[in-house]
Amino acid sequence: MSTYRKTYKNQSKRFNNGNNSNSTSTELTNLVEMFPDWEADELQGLLSENDNSLEIVIDLIVNNKVSKWEPIKKEKHKKKEHKDDTTDSVTGNANGASNSGSSNSTTASGDRRLNNKAKASTSSRPPKRQQHPNAAHKKNEKTERSKASTVSTTTTSATSSVTKESVPPSNSWAAALSNDKPKKQETKSEASESIPSSNDGGDAETVPEVEQAETLEESHQEPENVEEPIESVSEQSQPENTKPVLKSAAIPEPKQGSWASAIAPKTKPKPKTVSKPVPQPEESKPEEHIPVQEEAQPVESILEDKPAVEAVQPVQPPVEDEPVEAPAASSVAAVADASFSEPTASSIIDQQPQVVLPTTQQQVDSVGISFGSLSVDAGEPKEAAEVIQDETISEQVQPEQQQQSQQQPLQEQQRYGLYNQQPTQQRYQQNNYQQQGQYSKQQQQQQQQQTSQPTQQQQQYDYYGQYQQQQYPQQTAQPGAQFGGYPGFDYNAYNQQAFAAAAAASPAASHVATIGGGVGGYNQYAQQANSADSTQSPIVNQSTLQQQQAAVLAAQQQQQQLPTPFGYPAYYNYYYNNPYFNAGGLGSTGFSAPQQGTQQGTQQQQSQQSGQQQQQVSSANQQGSVSSNSFGAQQQYYNPNQFNSRYPGYSYPPQQQNQQSSQHTSGQSQQGAQTTSDGASDGQQTSQQGQSSQQPQQQQQQHAQPVPQQHMMPQYGAYQQYPQYGYQDSNQYRGGWY
């Protein structure tokens, strides 16, 4: 907002219209050509009223839906004059003289003062012209332009002063529009001209220098804005204008570089000049840095010469910001240059102690950092005092910087620390990485840790893989059958992809262990992992149980289990047992058939007996239970008793011994439920009673631990180790849910 304040002193209308005219310059010019009898102002008003829609305005005019503003003919003449001025200013001709002859002489004298001081400052600053070849080229162009514009600017500045004096909208507004039409920069220049003209009374001298500083700023910023070659070019060309014609016109052109800069930067310009050398080093332009150093010194001398400019100078903290920004913005380019830019910055600091990065950085905390011209106005008074301090500090710091110049690269990193320290380190690193197009620390670390990360990744994936192997054995069903029951989806490709990706990712992902690296391995492990991993963490010995149940499960699980995609808990299974309704062939596979259940129950009972003997009964039972999704599903939903929670995903997994007993109970109860088709499997005892005849031993052993069903010790917090975790069979509902 602060950037706009001065704009509205004299230029509120001009810039408001100027902005519109800038946006609608093409439409407006077309309309002016199409309807020469219409006033540009009227057309502009129509455009602004109709969202700058050329077609709508033409339609309105052609259909006489809109009529010219007839009554005000005098204003039309004035507007015509404005048009002339705009066209003249657009062409860059010095037409302002017609509007103000005496004002030209008066403003010309003011402009001459500006030119003298500006030239003095520019003479001290000429290396800036050398800073950019583009600047030199466009400087030549704009020097010519500035020559024309100097006449026009003397006239326009005179006219702007006249507009201040008499008809502020007339020349400056039309000039602003005309400049806006051809070039926003010119509008800015005239606007800035009107600004200095407004300031001509007492601030005219200060303002021209400020403008010079702005031009310098922008020239400096241009290296900063190398990413923004347009602005930098305009700004560079503008510095030429400022240098050859330090009149307000020349200054406004650098303002043209950035509209906000044209408005507010006057306060900044010198600080940016100071900042300018800094950004240049960051862009690693040592040649420019040296002139910038020279320039920065004259800038400070000028600043010292004029406290008002010093008030402008306080923006030096933004200078820090800008170098910071420049590394950020130009980090890509600067990273390549970073090795150069920072040492150049340090050497420049030595050469240019006046650019006090450390002190300004230190002060940046105290001084409100303003990026761009936003906070310039608000910060001016404080910044003025602080700028004085900055100058003194910079003077003090100059020897310090010389001393610190060697240290400075580190200090810059440190003082920029929040901004640059890591970025600079990363820049050096990124110099390597940018070549590879890698910037993120993660990538760097990955490159650095590529050796270490594969293991880490494996560990990470293993971390989940344990869950997945243990908790999602559901996943290990036949690949074809994985979602077979789930309507409308063919998950085979996804399963294969998931398997391949997971297998590539980590051993956990290799779902020969869990889901199965391949369909063959997938089926195999569906047998084994479902049986073994379903209940057990890989910690428990699964080999015996897996082997025991592998044969049984091989025939059954391959057909029976529907795995969710790798690592994916079958949530829809929780809510919708889509694959588990007989649709998936699960029921057809015989989950519903108590025969398999009984067979599995007996087999599981056998394995459970051996497992109990091995303390692995948990794996045995769940292997059996998992092996038949019916069992796993029963354990999940079908037996709410298992952990006194019918929500398997949230019940705490029992410790393995408890798991063994509880899973025996649950698994057997489920088995018994299937075998006995007891809906009462909710009561494990009932299901166990069904099984009790089959497995009195296990029941006795299991009853020894009746509570473990409620095991509150989560081995894996929210995750159950059980294949139950994802499984629900149609049996689940047959079992008596419904």
UniProtKB/Swiss-Prot annotation:
Residues 23-66 form the CUE domain. One of its GO terms (cellular component) is cytoplasm. The keyword Protein transport does not apply. InterPro entries: CUE. Residues 1-12, 126-140 have a biased composition (Basic residues). Pfam families: CUE. Ubiquitinated. Proteolytically cleaved by the proteasome in response to transcription stress; the resulting N-terminal form constitutes the activated nuclear form and the C-terminal portion is degraded. The keyword Cytoplasm applies. Residues 631-645 have a biased composition (Polar residues). Residues 202-216 have a biased composition (Acidic residues). It is found in: Cytoplasm; Nucleus; Chromosome, Telomere. Keywords: Chromosome, Cytoplasm, DNA damage, DNA repair, DNA-binding, Nucleus, Telomere, Ubl conjugation, Ubl conjugation pathway. Belongs to the DEF1 family. Homodimer; may form higher order oligomers. Interacts with the large RNA polymerase II subunit RPO21; the interaction is direct and serves to bridge RPO21 to the Elongin complex in a manner dependent on transcription stress. Interacts with RAD26. Recruits the ubiquitination machinery to RNA polymerase II for polyubiquitination, removal and degradation, when the transcription-coupled repair (TCR) factor RAD26 fails to efficiently displace stalled RNA polymerase II. Also involved in telomere length regulation. Binds DNA. This is RNA polymerase II degradation factor 1. The lineage of its organism: Eukaryota, Fungi, Dikarya, Ascomycota, Saccharomycotina. The gene is DEF1.
